[in-house]
């Protein structure tokens, strides 16, 4: 099956889908709790950009969801990012055991993946951004990228790259100074292709992993 994709902020009531995707895409050591993700979706829905999957309708059938004019890619080779911009590609099992995936029957829209972030005037990444939505400063100069996640069944279609590129363009439009993310060392070269530069080892200690901080500077 092929899909078209539209992009929008999440809705507070989609917290269960957001929490499930987090558990699927990260190992138990690095996944944030379902409660944390539901709370963030409820308090900061605009700080998520979600890719919504719409099954394409075969020719001759009623249009329905498949008619959404949006990005369409059937087999893109763009690699899914890793680290806290992750897809559970670290060889560890995901932490979604016992959780139920949201489907079109459970919610009107099916979220294929998302990028989540927080605005701040702080210059460097810290783990408190993951857990404390009150640290969000709507007019903050910098964008802290907290996660980039795509469900396994929707990977290899360029969604991760599209979500990241849309976020970069939006930050430019809003006049932000820079975007900051953390990743593992084997993903540094990939993020450099998106304009990010290595800053050094991050202060993040999430999951006992060595993270590297990178930034994409938009303004000097």
Label each PLM-derived region with a short phrase.
Residues 146, 153-155, 174, 180, ...:
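Acidic/histidine-enriched, beta-strand-rich ligand/metal-binding domains
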Residues 150, 156-169:
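Conserved acetyl-CoA-binding loop-helix of GNAT-fold acetyltransferases
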Residues 57-149, 155, 205-210:
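Conserved acyl-donor/pantetheine-binding loop and adjacent beta-alpha core of acyl/acetyltransferases
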Residues 9, 19-34, 40:
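Helix-loop element at the rim of GNAT/NAT acetyltransferase active sites that forms part
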Residues 4-17:
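A short beta-loop-alpha structural element at the N-terminal edge
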Residues 164, 171-184:
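Conserved GNAT acetyl-CoA-binding A-motif
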Residues 48-53:
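Cytosolic beta-strand hydrophobic patch enriched in CBS
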Residues 173, 185-209:
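Conserved active-site alpha-helix within GNAT-family acetyltransferase domains
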């Amino acid at each position: 099956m092929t899909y078209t994709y539209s992009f929008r902020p999440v809705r507070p009531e989609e917290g269960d889908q957001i929490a499930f995707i987090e558990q699927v895409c990260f190992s138990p050591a690095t996944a944030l709790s379902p409660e944390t993700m539901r709370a963030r979706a409820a308090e900061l829905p605009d700080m998520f950009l979600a890719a919504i999957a719409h099954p394409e309708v075969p020719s001759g059938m009623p249009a329905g969801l498949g008619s959404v004019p949006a990005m369409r890619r059937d087999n893109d080779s763009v690699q899914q990012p890793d680290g806290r911009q992750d897809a559970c590609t670290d060889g560890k099992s995901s932490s979604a055991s016992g959780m139920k995936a949201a489907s079109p029957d459970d919610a009107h829209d099916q979220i294929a993946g998302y990028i989540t972030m927080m605005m701040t005037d702080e210059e460097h990444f810290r783990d408190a951004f993951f857990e404390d939505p009150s640290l969000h400063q709507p007019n903050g100069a910098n964008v802290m990228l907290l996660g980039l996640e795509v469900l396994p069944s929707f990977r290899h279609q360029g969604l991760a790259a599209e979500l990241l590129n849309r976020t970069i363009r939006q930050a430019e439009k809003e006049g932000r100074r820079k975007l900051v993310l953390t990743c593992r060392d084997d993903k540094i070269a990939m993020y450099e292709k998106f304009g990010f530069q290595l800053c050094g080892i991050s202060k993040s200690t999430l999951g006992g992993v060595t993270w590297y901080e990178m930034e994409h500077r938009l303004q000097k």
